[in-house]
């Protein structure tokens, strides 16, 4: 789990991997039990998938985040430092600290492929945050070096039809701004320093 923070996790697929790689007979039920023990010990938190357009929860897979990134890094002997995943986990922890419920968003978009056929694409919103009547859709992006990368990060946000705030939190010190589509871009330091940064 420590090496796959921010990744969709399915106990059945994990059990299959254990069976194939380790020749273990561990079941998905046992893995799910272990995951719930890690949650009960406040080592991991589970973030459920939420179908934004269908307004319902999707049972599996879910994402797990470490409550303490220091413990996660120590478990991996400080070797596996993927900044993108660490930043996503850090944002998750800060959102939870601010009292929000945090889910992983799923939105379907229909588009044309190279042959002109309609194809449905499943897009992910890193965080769907709720607090009372307020909601925010948040993407975590370590860097946005090209317009292509910007378009990739905001594709899921563009596919959401409601008027709740849509935000991309970036690494580095880029200035806060709002684009012509109403999507806010906010750097990680400004996000962490100001408890009201999502409401600017």
Put a short name on every predicted segment.
Residues 29-200:
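A cross-kingdom feature that marks ATP-driven nucleic-acid transaction machinery
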Residues 1-40, 46:
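Conserved helicase/translocase motor-coupling segment
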């Amino acid at each position: 789990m420590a090496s796959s923070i921010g990744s969709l996790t399915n106990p059945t697929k994990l059990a299959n991997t254990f069976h194939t790689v380790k020749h273990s007979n561990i079941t998905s039920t046992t893995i799910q039990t272990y995951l719930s023990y890690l949650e009960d010990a406040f080592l991991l938190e589970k973030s459920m998938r939420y179908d934004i357009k269908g307004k319902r929860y999707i049972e599996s897979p879910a994402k797990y985040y470490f409550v303490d990134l220091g413990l996660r890094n120590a478990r991996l002997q400080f070797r596996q430092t993927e900044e993108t995943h660490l930043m996503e986990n850090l944002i998750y922890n800060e959102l939870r600290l601010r009292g929000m419920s945090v889910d992983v968003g799923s939105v379907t978009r229909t588009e044309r492929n190279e042959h002109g056929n309609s194809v449905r694409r499943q897009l992910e919103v890193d965080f769907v945050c709720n607090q009372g009547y307020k909601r925010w859709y948040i993407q975590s992006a370590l860097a946005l070096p090209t317009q292509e990368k910007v378009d990739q990060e905001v594709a899921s946000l563009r596919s959401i039809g409601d008027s709740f705030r849509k935000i991309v939190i970036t690494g580095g010190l880029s200035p806060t701004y709002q684009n012509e589509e109403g999507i806010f871009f906010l750097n990680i330091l400004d996000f962490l320093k100001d408890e009201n940064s999502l409401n600017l």
